[in-house]
Amino acid sequence: MANFAAITGWGMAVPERVLTNADLERMVETSDEWIQTRTGIRERRIAGPGEHTSALSIAAGRAALARAGLDAAQIDTVILATCTPDRPFPATACTVQAGVGARRAAAFDIVAACSGFVYGLQVATSMVRSGAARNVLFVACDIFTHFINWNDRNTCVLFGDGAGAVVLQPSDEPAGLLSCVLGADGEQEDLMAVDAGGTRLPATPELLEEGRQYVFMNGREIFKHAVREMAASSFDALQAAGLSTDDVALVIPHQANLRIIEATAKRLEVPLDRVFVNLDRYGNTSAASIPIALVEAVEQQRLRKGDYALLTSFGGGLTWASAVIRWSAG
């Protein structure tokens, strides 16, 4: 059994189509100034025909495998964090497994909404450290724009689509996930949800007419819960790793809303120049937001070998998750 699970590969994929705030001005009653002031978003990527969850996940997964220098046949486990699967079943991870060529590898989905990447990172790391898996391909992908009411300016301006992936392998040196704090409050499940389409409320013509197949969220309440839980779980994760915010080279938060990111950074007493932000170009990509940010942080050399990074997220459920990782790749 390994002491640690190092991140040896990473990759991302986003749709080709870019939807700007100027485009949205022509679709709903809104403005670039209104959107940027309230969210910090300038544009987002929108999935088109053929750019479904498995397709983006396969593209991100292939990029991560190439970076790790692994053949897909060496992967023994494929995990996908998503709440927008290709279809109710089978698990979309099985489609990803076949698509990347990881023949006969174990494959399963996990659902933790926007917290999915950190939740899945804990699962993947535990499998590697326990010896249950050796080479894990972990992908996070969501296509929320298929569940958006494009007449609702409060939600249609927020979301974008994308996928991010990492490869985890055993390591005897301190690397990868050092600590992780997961949490949820199911009593707040209705603050953000898609009501129709499950076994509680199967999609019927009447529910579709009511728009119950679209994302609903109580933004004001989400803001309060998000800032509180992201900050609290971040401090807990740092304490579990024996570190303080001063030891962290970079904070990589879930890219939901610039106001949430700024308020969380303030509670953590971390200057914004040590907080990675790219939601201005991608919007809220749900579970994919942290791995996409991670890939770009590495590309921009804001995360280097030996650095500690704090990942923190919050999502529907309500769920939250924070983790400390040590970057070991050169």
Curated annotation (Swiss-Prot):
Gene3D superfamilies reported in the protein's UniProt record: 3.40.47.10
SUPFAM superfamilies: Thiolase-like
Record's catalysed reaction(s): malonyl-[ACP] + acetyl-CoA + H(+) = 3-oxobutanoyl-[ACP] + CO2 + CoA
Pathway given in the UniProt record: Lipid metabolism; fatty acid biosynthesis
GO molecular function, one term: beta-ketoacyl-acyl-carrier-protein synthase III activity
GO BP terms in the entry: fatty acid biosynthetic process; secondary metabolite biosynthetic process
Residues the record marks as active site: C114, H254, N284
EC number, as in UniProt: 2.3.1.180
InterPro entries per the UniProt record, alphabetical: ACP_syn_III_C, ACP_syn_III_N, FabH, Thiolase-like
PANTHER family xref list: 3-OXOACYL-[ACYL-CARRIER-PROTEIN] SYNTHASE 3, BETA-KETOACYL-[ACYL-CARRIER-PROTEIN] SYNTHASE III
Note on domains (UniProt): The last Arg residue of the ACP-binding site is essential for the weak association between ACP/AcpP and FabH.
Complexes and interactors: Homodimer.
Protein name: Beta-ketoacyl-[acyl-carrier-protein] synthase III
Native organism: Roseiflexus castenholzii (strain DSM 13941 / HLO8)
Gene (UniProt): fabH
